[in-house]
Amino acid sequence: MLYYFYSIFHINIFQYITVRAGIAFFFAFFLTLYLMPKFIRWAMKKSSYQPIYSLAPEHHKKKANTPTMGGVVFIFSALLASLLTVKIHNPYVLGGFLTILGFLAIGVIDDYGKITKRSNQSGLSAKQKFFLQILVAFVVSLFLYEYAHLNSNLYVPFYKYPLLDMKIFGILFWTLVIVATSNAVNLTDGLDGLATVPSIMALTTLAIITYITGNAVLSHYLLLPKIIGVGEVSIIAAAFAGSLIGFLWYNCHPAEVFMGDSGSLTLGAFIGYMAIISKSEVLLILIGFVFVMEALSVIIQVGSFKLRKKRVFLMAPIHHHFEQKNWNESKIIVRFWIIALISNLIALITLKIR
């Protein structure tokens, strides 16, 4: 909307992505700070509490009366801030909104089932959730290929030329990226603030890359692919970063509210979407290294138990492994934040080395 003020009234400052991203960031931050306490009070009245997994470490039982679905609040704040600041007609913006709303719907349905039936196993079944994730991700990927005409080249760090053109198979690859990232962030969201800060870092890194990719001068200088119009999505990322910092105020240890699947599934999907449109699918391994660690620990644990009847970790995802080793929860969280910070800095450094 602010961009159209520039078009109508010729207020030049609103044509700049960086200015609108800054406005979106602070608007979403303050709106989340304002709305979250109201949501927490409402959720407690409605007994919208987070069901605790029966096999979770013993000290998690004290989290049983913590409200969940806080993701709905910070996503609403981010979406409203985005609607006020982006070019709505931009195809990459539309694809981002489609991703956010689709995965938000899946998360809300799942969270609502868990809350109403007071069980962590009573939301969507794993098969139902996976099917819906694939469906939404496929529609988004098809939209990018057919409507946004996003090129299907695959790029890798340290190499300035595309490794290969996936052509129509890019749709399947992009679907995999979105679904995998969505589930990886969801697995990470097991301790207070554990998924929140790495998500802020990943969104910030991807906002920078997306802005560069959409800028003809900067993309040429850094030898990155030039994708006209994609920089507009960095405003949505800035809005999410702002709303997440506002959410962290209440989600830091000891958490007053959890984001729920409505938050984690949506965040992960949007992070995956940003990696796709900025041609950073492979670099996403570094950008979301904490998420990769968490997801791999589950894959290794399940695979090892099925093949060898032995567990590699005391418990998976890996943050629970460290809990079982009697690490303090705050220490685990901060150390994972440090890992996320270092991996994102390395990811940014790779942009210059080509």
UniProtKB/Swiss-Prot annotation:
Pathway: Cell wall biogenesis; peptidoglycan biosynthesis. It comes from the Bacteria. It holds the Pfam family Glycos_transf_4. The keyword Hydrolase does not apply. Its cofactor is Mg(2+). It is an enzyme of class 2 (transferase). Its EC number is 2.7.8.13. GO terms for cellular component: plasma membrane. InterPro entries: Glycosyl_transferase_4, PNAcMuramoyl-5peptid_Trfase, PNAcMuramoyl-5peptid_Trfase_CS. It catalyses: UDP-N-acetyl-alpha-D-muramoyl-L-alanyl-gamma-D-glutamyl-meso-2,6-diaminopimeloyl-D-alanyl-D-alanine + di-trans,octa-cis-undecaprenyl phosphate = di-trans,octa-cis-undecaprenyl diphospho-N-acetyl-alpha-D-muramoyl-L-alanyl-D-glutamyl-meso-2,6-diaminopimeloyl-D-alanyl-D-alanine + UMP. Keywords: Cell cycle, Cell division, Cell inner membrane, Cell membrane, Cell shape, Cell wall biogenesis/degradation, Magnesium, Membrane, Metal-binding, Peptidoglycan synthesis, Transferase, Transmembrane, Transmembrane helix. CDD domains: GT_MraY. It is found in: Cell inner membrane. GO terms for molecular function: metal ion binding; phospho-N-acetylmuramoyl-pentapeptide-transferase activity; UDP-N-acetylmuramoyl-L-alanyl-D-glutamyl-meso-2,6-diaminopimelyl-D-alanyl-D-alanine:undecaprenyl-phosphate transferase activity. PANTHER family: PHOSPHO-N-ACETYLMURAMOYL-PENTAPEPTIDE-TRANSFERASE (PTHR22926), PHOSPHO-N-ACETYLMURAMOYL-PENTAPEPTIDE-TRANSFERASE HOMOLOG (PTHR22926:SF5). This is Phospho-N-acetylmuramoyl-pentapeptide-transferase. It comes from Nitratiruptor sp. (strain SB155-2).
